Amino acid sequence: KPILNSVNGEEQSLATVLPLVKKYGASVVGLALDENGIPKTAEGRFEIAKRIVERAEAVGIDRKDVYIDCLTLTVSAEQAACRQTLEALHRVKTELGCKTCLGVSNISFGLPNRELVNRTFLTMAMEQGLDLPIINPNVESMTGAVRAFRVLNGIDKNSLEFINAYNDAVPAAPVKKADSNVDIFAAVYNGLKNEGAAATAKLLETTDAMQVVNEMLIPALDRVGEDFEKNKIFLPQLIQSAN
């Protein structure tokens, strides 16, 4: 779905842009400013955001299709503005239930070591409910901050995305649908509980249970332990394999 950039709290903007968004079935970015400019307070920006959401719903646009941008101001010029942006973002997320977006790099304009400031601000904003950060994806420290946040906040289940991004080890071969020793080995190694259970159940139709344990399951778990010690796999993968 396209995202139209953008509408703001000014009456002319609301009356012109929102009907187009509804007509073409798009989503829309709502800027927390109006004819008076950008409010200095979180309360002021929240009220504009609320106005945008209510007007959007009045023309039949679901609030889940409205991305509110609480606007990032340069901290070197207006240091208090950072907290106001974050507070407004939090209120939009919790009280209006909207998705949020925010440009990140403007926060550090005029400061040395801009990347450090940007990364820290990004993490603070995500903690307050930021959904769509506008960042340069080619800056590894920024994408890395997003990945780490997703792990720490329980979004990246079992840290799989993080591990795949930073683990140089070659992954084990995918499980095939044939009933062979390799299938059970790969299922255990990769922590594929359902596939491993199915392969084991099928093999038990023709093979003694102790033979399956001693010749297939134990060697697979041994390999998992060895690769964990060599830092080829990591704790979430070890736990999945054990399960």
Model-derived regions: residue spans:
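ATP-dependent carboxylate/acyl-activation modules
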Residues: 1-65, 73-101, 105-243
